[in-house]
Regions:
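A residue-identity detector for tryptophan
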Residues: 1, 13, 71, 102, ...
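N-terminal amphipathic/basic-hydrophobic helices that include classical n-h-c signal peptides
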Residues: 1-26
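Extended rod-forming repeat segments used as scaffolds/tethers
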Residues: 10, 19-21, 88, 177, ...
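Short, flexible coil/linker elements and helix-boundary hinge sites characteristic
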Residues: 12, 18, 56, 160-163, ...
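Acidic, small-residue rich beta-repeat scaffolds with periodic aromatic anchors
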Residues: 13, 25-153, 232-269
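Intrinsically disordered regions, especially transient/low-confidence alpha-helical propensity segments
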Residues: 68, 99, 182-184, 209
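Long amphipathic alpha-helical scaffold segments
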Residues: 136-189
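C-terminal, beta-strand-rich globular interaction domains
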Residues: 188-269
Length: 269
């Protein structure tokens, strides 16, 4: 690639690697139910050329090294932050049967390098403009609004391409606005005698908090279980089942290990 080529080039190594494992790709009866905001790699041509010269790398090798050294962590941080809104959209959105789409990725970019809507193994990707400099200066609430705005803009483009009514996603956005952009929900509850025990999830930009909520006739108590990174991959496996055994109520993970426990006699006092 010559130096005269001025537009930003994008790289999505993780996505390609992940999707290459989907050997049984089908083009019919897919359910669209997953959404993601991404910060795709923007090539720094000077850095790439310096890597080529200093480490005797090919152009592609230098780009991959530059991505891993200078971009991968930034991208991961943005994806994790944006999960606060994208996971809320996924939770409220009713899956739609499509011909060939199960996920939509909206790439947030300073400059549109690819105006087309791309489809790779059922994952549709579209780019939207995003002001990262402004985003960093905003309050958490305003950051959530900007993230949701970018997601909505990209989803509407793909929905129109797939002839999906945009009202389906607009209704979800309205619900999020009514909830003041707070991504909180009850995962599971269990009633023991007259007391209701539940697990509450609070998904913020920088973390996910899991709580016990204990509701009795005359009082309600919340206890923090633990905080996790803001991605389903980090906290999702902790939520498997609530099990009462003896004098304890256990939160068990998917390996049947104890995440947290409550002593029922103590609660009853």
């Amino acid at each position: 690639m010559g130096k005269s080529e001025g537009r930003a080039q994008t790289l999505d190594l993780d996505l390609r690697l992940n999707l290459s494992t989907r050997k049984n790709y089908e083009t019919t009866n897919m359910k669209l139910q997953y959404f993601e905001l991404d910060k795709p790699y923007v090539e720094n041509q000077q850095r790439v050329e310096e890597l080529m010269d200093s480490a005797a790398l090919t152009y592609e090798e230098a780009r991959i090294k530059d991505y891993r050294q200078n971009w991968k962590d930034l991208r991961r941080a943005f994806v994790y932050e944006s999960k606060c809104m994208t996971s809320m959209v996924e939770r409220l959105f009713k899956p739609v049967v499509t011909k060939d789409c199960w996920k939509i990725i909206v790439e947030c970019v300073d400059t549109i390098s690819n105006p087309s809507i791309m489809n790779l193994l059922g994952v549709y990707t579209v780019q939207v403009l995003f002001d990262f400099s402004s985003y960093k200066t905003l309050s958490p609430l305003e950051q959530k609004k900007l993230l949701l705005e970018a997601l909505l803009k990209g989803l509407k483009r793909v929905f129109k391409e797939l002839s999906i009514p945009c009202s389906l996603i607009e209704d979800v956005v309205n619900e999020i606005e009514k909830n003041d952009y707070e991504n909180s929900w009850e995962w599971k509850r269990k009633k023991i005698q007259s007391t209701i025990f539940s697990i509450q999830v609070e998904h913020q930009l920088d973390k996910v908090d899991l709580f016990w909520k204990i509701e009795q006739k005359d009082k309600s108590i919340r206890q923090l279980i633990q905080s996790y990174p803001a991605h389903e991959m980090d906290y999702g496996a902790k939520l498997c089942k609530l099990e009462a055994k003896g004098n304890f109520l256990y939160l068990l993970d998917k390996e049947n290990e104890v995440v947290s426990k409550l002593e029922l006699e103590t609660i009853a006092e």
